[in-house]
C-alpha cells in the first residue's frame, strides 16, 4: 500500500516522454527562428519548415511557402546556397503544402501523436503556419530521431522540398 504513490509517480514519469509536444503560438514579434524581423508579415498566409542541426552535417535552413506562390529559402549551414533566396511558383504549391501539414496533424493541439524512444543528435524539423488570427504563428518541433515522429518528419520535409523545387539550394556542393 505504501508503494502505490511511488508506483504512480514512476508511471507518470515514464508516460511524459511518450506524449507529443503540443504546438505553440508565437506572436509576430517572436516569429523569426533566427531572431530579427520575421520573413512573413501579419495577415499573410504561409506554411513553413525549418531543418535544425544534428551531430553530423544536416542542412540548417528555413523554407516558407506563401498563399500567393512565393517561396523563401534561408540557407544557414550545410546547404547548397546560403542566405535568403526567393522564387515564385503557383498558389497550388501553398495549397498542397498546407494540406500536407494539416493531414500530418503536427500543428493540431488535440492530436495524440505518440512519441517513443529518441536517438541522440538527430535533427529537429520545425513545422510552422500562420495562426487564424493572422498576427501570430503556430509552431511544433518534430524530432526526426524519435519513434512516432521519424516517418512524419521525413514525409513532411520531402513534400516541402519536392513541391518547392529547392533541392539544388538545399544539397551542399561537393
Describe each region flagged by the PLM.
Residues 7-15:
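Bacterial N-terminal signal peptides
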Residues 61, 83-87, 134-139:
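Short beta-strand segments
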Residues 59, 63-76, 121-123:
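A short, structured beta-strand/loop element
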Residues 73-109:
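A short-motif feature that recognizes glycine-rich, charge-decorated loops
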Amino acid at each position: 500500500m505504501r508503494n502505490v504513490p511511488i508506483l504512480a509517480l514512476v508511471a507518470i514519469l515514464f508516460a511524459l516522454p511518450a506524449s507529443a509536444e503540443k504546438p505553440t503560438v508565437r506572436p509576430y514579434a517572436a516569429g523569426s527562428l533566427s531572431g530579427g524581423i520575421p520573413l512573413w508579415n501579419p495577415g499573410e498566409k504561409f506554411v513553413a519548415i525549418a531543418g535544425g542541426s544534428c551531430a553530423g552535417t544536416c542542412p540548417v535552413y528555413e523554407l516558407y511557402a506563401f498563399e500567393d506562390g512565393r517561396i523563401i529559402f534561408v540557407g544557414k549551414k550545410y546547404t547548397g546556397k546560403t542566405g535568403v533566396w526567393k522564387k515564385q511558383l503557383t498558389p497550388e504549391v501553398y495549397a498542397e503544402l498546407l494540406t500536407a501539414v494539416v493531414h500530418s496533424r503536427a500543428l493540431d493541439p488535440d492530436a495524440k501523436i505518440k512519441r517513443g524512444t529518441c536517438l541522440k543528435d538527430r535533427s529537429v524539423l520545425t513545422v510552422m503556419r500562420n495562426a487564424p488570427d493572422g498576427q501570430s504563428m503556430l509552431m511544433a518541433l518534430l524530432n526526426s530521431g524519435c519513434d512516432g515522429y521519424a516517418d512524419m518528419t521525413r514525409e513532411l520535409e520531402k513534400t516541402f522540398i519536392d513541391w518547392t523545387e529547392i533541392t539544388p539550394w538545399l544539397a551542399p556542393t561537393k
